[in-house]
């Protein structure tokens, strides 16, 4: 008999029903469960697949460069970044008819095009690219890197080049190489690029491979470095009247500490960023030499962790046993990596708009909105994934004997206290926040807005004042002109920073009031509830009072039959599934808040947000309804406009989202009956019955149907908001 899919599981391959296909897809990446898997093959497969992942990433970024060079308007955008709309790529087949062709022909293009809202134009411009030839060169280089990654992946699957398990478990060497190599050397290389290429380009000097060795990045060359006069590199920075990309008002400094933003581009000073990356490189190059490898010097991770025993013995055996637990569990390592990456991605979202690094991106409002929303959603998915793999660790990899009385065991032992405290916090936040919103709503409805309960966020305002914001009248730390910190920084970074923080046109430390206080607590409710579900799912993954033997049932099980009535919906997978809905809703509130606050800031009517955000009807009417009106008019009886594609996506997003409920609110029996009826009809219909299949059609399992429902809910939800966000912002600001 020919080998059937899935080859990695003979048990599944012999399944006579369509379950074979769906379970095969579902477990394709669960290498641990495959036939004939060994620890060595598991590590080698994952390692090789990383190269494939890198190849895809480089191919994708190469494609971005290539399409902009081929079909974009980069060179004309560079001449006037504030008024030319950047083109992502052409549209081959604009729907529908001549009005569509006219609506989508913009940005100086000859035919219909898509506008870029990704910020790549600003990024490439900032790092020194200026011509289409530069873009083509970059695309070709990344294509080469992609091919090398693929070859490396293939190579590391060959017997001679397969690394051993001991190589994968050499934590110190990996840490040293990742700290020094990945972060240290790459930051140093980036500093080099900024100093040798990007900063000269910002001053009108075109440095490429042909003149790279002839152009001094600084008039003094390397002299100050070797004589210890490093301050010379900071002297004569670009002036406030500097025109980016020209020598007008340009200085000669390469490593500065100016603070604040370049007045014309509204982005951080390039010389400040070069300085920052040099400092990061220095720190990480040192950090990458701290762990003991072949040379017998430096820290041993195991010794470090074993020494971490809290004094007085009140917290048990501290970190004893953690080294082997983490080093032998891929799920634990993945959980840690995802948790870190998720937090970093969310921080990227927060910093990209408040401290823009790329020239002119702050004035491209749609791009700012798109990048913030994109990074927050990505962060949400990554963070929920961290808890999912944490739960799988507890089920598959956790060894109670190895972790006796250490921090991990103690987390499990007092999980009731953790879960109940989180539950209390969520209930408190939810009822109080909703109570305030509903009260204010009723007061507005009855025409007595003065009876609203409006709470000033005085603690947050105090923190903003401590960082130098003067408008609240707190005379504290950096907002106090006679403090030591203020005086110490007056000649260095502070003037730029204080100008930026008190300038009302940027997004640095926005002025906050009662509307912000309320939505902040609504978001806190969402964060705490999402965390509650995820933490409970992981801590109860091995077992609970209700189901002490839960770990024997694995990560995702629907129920343990009718005999134990209460065991449905309590697998660790179910917790993840529920948490994703909460995560999506929470990030919905986060992005609504960010977007509305910024729309009013950009339009110069901040009072609309301040007055309408304190009650629910204000959010529904003055944010959602008001901003979707243009979107809903993408198609109308008079034809179409450039927003029509977003109008279509808005409708389509709702359709996908609603389809999710079809899977979420009906279970196996219904579908099984339906499938059997359809199969019966198919077999008795002429022509149709010429098509036969080997597998008996059966309904999806409960867990799989939930996954399909969740996928549709998530994709539809994000599609809908993406269309709303881009259309409402670009419709207002072009």
From Swiss-Prot:
It catalyses: reduced [plastocyanin] + hnu + oxidized [2Fe-2S]-[ferredoxin] = oxidized [plastocyanin] + reduced [2Fe-2S]-[ferredoxin]. The chain crosses the membrane at residues 46-69, 135-158, 175-199, 273-291, 330-353, 369-395, 417-439, 517-535, 575-596, 643-665, 707-727. [4Fe-4S] cluster binds at residues 559, 568. Keywords: 4Fe-4S, Chlorophyll, Chloroplast, Chromophore, Electron transport, Iron, Iron-sulfur, Magnesium, Membrane, Metal-binding, Oxidoreductase, Photosynthesis, Photosystem I, Plastid, Thylakoid, Transmembrane, Transmembrane helix, Transport. Disulfide bonds: none annotated. It comes from Lactuca sativa (Garden lettuce). Chlorophyll a B1 binds at residue 654. The keyword Zinc-finger does not apply. The PsaA/B heterodimer binds the P700 chlorophyll special pair and subsequent electron acceptors. PSI consists of a core antenna complex that captures photons, and an electron transfer chain that converts photonic excitation into a charge separation. The eukaryotic PSI reaction center is composed of at least 11 subunits. GO terms for molecular function: 4 iron, 4 sulfur cluster binding; chlorophyll binding; electron transfer activity; magnesium ion binding; oxidoreductase activity. The keyword Metal-binding applies. P700 is a chlorophyll a/chlorophyll a' dimer, A0 is one or more chlorophyll a, A1 is one or both phylloquinones and FX is a shared 4Fe-4S iron-sulfur center. It is found in: Plastid, Chloroplast thylakoid membrane. This is Photosystem I P700 chlorophyll a apoprotein A2. GO terms for biological process: photosynthesis. Phylloquinone binds at residue 671.
